[in-house]
């Protein structure tokens, strides 16, 4: 089988790249092995919250001047980063996903996490409340409502986070008949299953009535982010019907807004004419005259997937885009050059909460994100997303936007 572009990986970066190329007339194939990081996404997209040395960042665009030359943002260039950032909201809107930025165009916004802390973000789905400052205050009384038996929304943590910032919180649980049926099997009490139940109009309206019964004049009502899986408008309707300011706070994974975003992006790719190959993974490649001529997958066996261009977006260690042994780290499909320290004791920190260097391992590329193999550029193989060397996206809080911006950059390179 032959395509204009074959993309390996089914996550955020591969879908953005595939949609962009497909809409430009390229015949694209995405090979996806399964779940991706969007399933664990909060529904917010971070641009940069810390420099590599750990310095907190409030104004990411200004701070990018301090990034090393090998960082993906440095390779894209600050002016191109600004241009791509302006393209992101309309791009996602065309896919059925509404994004917004905080009040200050140059600064990070801040969202409340399931642990009750504030985390920086650049863009947010409309599901989330993006606060303009890390010093935000929540004055007044707040009612935190959870479903009985739903353990992935820790109301005590959430209450502590809001009370630390001025709110007076009260916690209540509700027993919704449709959700109670899920409790027969404890493994079914997960955010996505509740969200599917709450997609029904009679169910979410009944939930609103249960919340109203628990209210005693609170100015704020805080709810778990388990609504709008099939239709995000449900959240707007809930906000309209509850006589207080409604704040949705994310739950522990799986993430309802993240999974909805993944489904909408996949739908946009397929509606544009792209081919999505789920439940499969690239296992080998053939190289001719320094160029990739084809790949083979686990399920298709001897069938050659040929293309003019290949894009590697299979993630780092999380997505099996990189593989480790006690002695080395390698890229398993193409044998690409991987950047990592030879001293294994430098791969990790014994303090779990500290910066973990192994999360910054990645494939070496040139300034256009073409992969390096044996020190030589592979002209028709590009790398995007978290598989790129030069950044530790988890420590920097840059994962989503590195994925999106590198995908936009590479799609432009391919279309030139």
Write out the residue ranges for each language-model feature.
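Glycine-/small-residue-rich beta->alpha transition segments that form the dinucleotide
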Residues: 34, 257, 299-302, 307-309, ...
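Short hydrophobic core segments
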Residues: 5-8, 29-31, 282, 304-316, ...
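N-terminal Rossmann-like FAD-binding beta1-loop-alpha1 element of flavoenzymes
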Residues: 3-30, 411
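Conserved N-terminal glycine-rich FAD pyrophosphate-binding loop of Rossmann-like flavoproteins
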Residues: 33-69, 178-194, 401
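A conserved FAD-binding loop/helix module that cradles the flavin
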Residues: 42, 319-326, 379, 386-416
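Conserved beta-strand-loop-beta-strand element in the redox core of flavoprotein oxidoreductases
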Residues: 266, 283-304, 310
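FAD-binding beta-loop-beta segment adjacent to the flavin cofactor pocket
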Residues: 301-302, 338-343, 347-396
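Helical element adjacent to the flavin cofactor pocket in flavoenzyme catalytic cores
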Residues: 153, 157-165, 197-221, 227-285, ...
């Amino acid at each position: 089988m032959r395509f204009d572009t074959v993309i390996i990986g089914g996550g955020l970066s591969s879908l953005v790249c595939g949609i962009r190329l497909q809409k430009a007339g390229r015949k694209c194939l995405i090979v996806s092995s399964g779940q991706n990081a969007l399933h664990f996404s909060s529904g917010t997209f971070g641009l940069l919250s810390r420099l590599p040395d750990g310095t907190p960042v409030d104004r990411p665009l200004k701070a990018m001047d301090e990034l090393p030359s090998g960082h993906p943002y440095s390779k894209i260039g600050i002016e191109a980063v600004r241009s791509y950032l302006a393209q992101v909201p309309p791009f996602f809107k065309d896919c059925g996903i509404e994004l917004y930025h905080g009040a200050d165009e140059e600064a990070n916004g801040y969202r409340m996490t399931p642990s009750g802390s504030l985390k920086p973000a650049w863009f947010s789905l409309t599901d989330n409340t993006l606060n303009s400052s890390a010093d935000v205050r929540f004055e007044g009384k707040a009612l935190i409502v959870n479903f009985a038996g739903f353990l992935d929304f820790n109301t005590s943590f959430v209450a502590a986070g809001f009370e630390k910032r001025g709110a007076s919180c009260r916690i209540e649980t509700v027993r919704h008949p449709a959700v109670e049926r899920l409790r027969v099997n404890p493994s079914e009490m997960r955010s996505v299953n509740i969200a599917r139940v709450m997609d029904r109009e009679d169910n979410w309206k009944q939930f609103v009535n249960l919340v109203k019964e628990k209210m005693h004049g609170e100015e704020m009502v805080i709810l778990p982010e388990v609504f709008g899986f099939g239709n995000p408008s449900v959240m707007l309707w809930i906000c309209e019907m509850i006589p207080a300011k409604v704040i949705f706070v994310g739950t522990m994974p799986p993430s309802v807004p993240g999974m909805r975003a993944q489904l909408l992006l996949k739908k946009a790719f397929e509606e544009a004419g792209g081919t999505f190959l789920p439940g499969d993974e690239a296992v080998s490649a053939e190289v001719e005259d320094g160029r990739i001529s084809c790949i083979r997958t686990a399920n298709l066996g001897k069938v050659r997937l040929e293309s003019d261009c290949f894009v590697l977006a299979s993630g780092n260690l999380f997505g099996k885009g990189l593989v480790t042994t006690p002695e080395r780290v390698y890229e398993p499909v193409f044998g690409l050059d991987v950047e990592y320290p030879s001293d294994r004791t430098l791969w990790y920190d014994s303090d779990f909460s500290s910066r973990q260097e192994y999360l910054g391992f990645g494939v070496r590329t040139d300034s256009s994100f073409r992969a390096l193999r044996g020190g030589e550029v592979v002209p028709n193989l590009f790398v995007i997303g978290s598989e790129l060397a030069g950044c530790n996206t988890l420590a920097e809080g840059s994962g989503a936007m590195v994925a999106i911006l590198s995908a936009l950059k590479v799609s432009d390179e391919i279309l030139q």
